Every structure is written in C-alpha cells, then in structure tokens.
Amino acid sequence: MKRVVAVMVLMGFLVLSVVFYGRTYSRVAAAISNASGGETKLRVVIDPGHGGNDPGGIGVSGVLEKDVNLSVALFLKANLEAQGFEVIMTRDTDKALYSSESSTNKKKEDLAKRIEIITEAKPDFVLCIHQNIFTDAKYSGAQVFYYQDSEEGARLASCLQNQLIAGVDPENTRVPKSNMNYFMLKNSPAPIVIVECGFLTNTEEEAKLGTEEYQRKLAWNIYLGTMHYINGEGQGSAGTETESE
C-alpha cells in the first residue's frame, strides 16, 4: 500500500512539473514567435564594456574584462539574431570608442559615444555586458543593475537576474540593483541594464568566465531572460550594491 501511495505521489509531482514547465516553455515560445514573426523586428543594442586600451577589470590570473565582455556579447548577438532580432553592437572588435585625437577624458568620450550609438539606434532596450571586481575575493555571482527611475529597466533586470540564477548559478542570492549614478544608466534614452556576469576577482569564477563554454552559457541565459521580459514577466527589486564597472 505504501508503495502504491508513493507511486501516486510521484506521478502527481511529474504531472505538475510537466504542466508548470510546459506553460513556461509555451510563454517563452510565444515571445520568440512574436519577436521573430512580427512586421517590425525588435531592435536591441548590445554594449560590451571597455575595449582597446581600456581592459576594464583584470582577473586574479590575468583574464581581461574587455575580452570576456566582447565574447559574451557576440554569442548573445548570435542568439538574438537567430530569433529575428535586429542587433546593433556598440563595438564588435577589441577597440575603444574614443577618437585617436583624444588626449584627456578618454573614458568620458568613450561612454558618450556609446550613448550616441544607442540614441541613434532607437532600440527597444539595451544590454550592457560587464564583469565585476571587488577588493574581497570571496564575492561571486552575476548581478544586474538598472536605472532607479526606470520601471521597464527594473522589469528587464528582474527577468535577467532570475534567469541567470536559474540557468547559471542556483546558489547565487543576488537581486537586481537600482542605481542613479552610472553614466550609461542615467543617459540612455531606452530601457537599459548592466549585466555584471561575475567576479574576476574570485579565483573560481574567473576560471569559468575565461572559458568559451561558460561565456556561451551566460549569453544563452541572458537571451532567455530577454524572452521573459518581452513576454511581460518580471518586476523590480532592490538589494545590496557591490562595486561595478
């Protein structure tokens, strides 16, 4: 009798699982269909941070943030384009965006150029790809930042954070974080988030961030997070802020 009850409980759990994940898959599939099948393509700007003479963060074993940013961004671009998105990159090679004549305020000029590209593109939303660093090597995990006065930015950040936890690191307890000071967040005319994929200052996470397999995994889950956003999911939340950019 106990064995029969156990089997029935297991079957019930399996049915519920199929229903739950089936509905989730259907919602995502519908979002993909809408994104690729409509008369007007969704337009996305992907912004791989840093580049050229600006390496960004440097990992404990020498992994450069600019390289990881670009690799993840290119994989993400391929995922989005495969589903019919129009994708504009602020950079698709290892280059900075300031002019060769610039002698001072190169960082400011670089960021201003990125905003100029976004403004001209008129995207539906913007995905900035970065890696995190911190003085304490114990910190790890992806975290998504959004402009504090942007409801759509908060919703996008929520979708991405949830998917990065579910698909990349279930032990990650970070939540989306609002910010009012980051140049890109406060100057973008479109909903924008900064995706900090992980900490280069954490030995174990840096080792993963430097591999193509993990970069592809990050890109895929960022892509899935955008699908949830397009489908109307997500809500804003706030948490403890860590160092970014």
Predicted regions and their residues:
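Catalytic-site microenvironment of enzymes
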Residues: 1-245
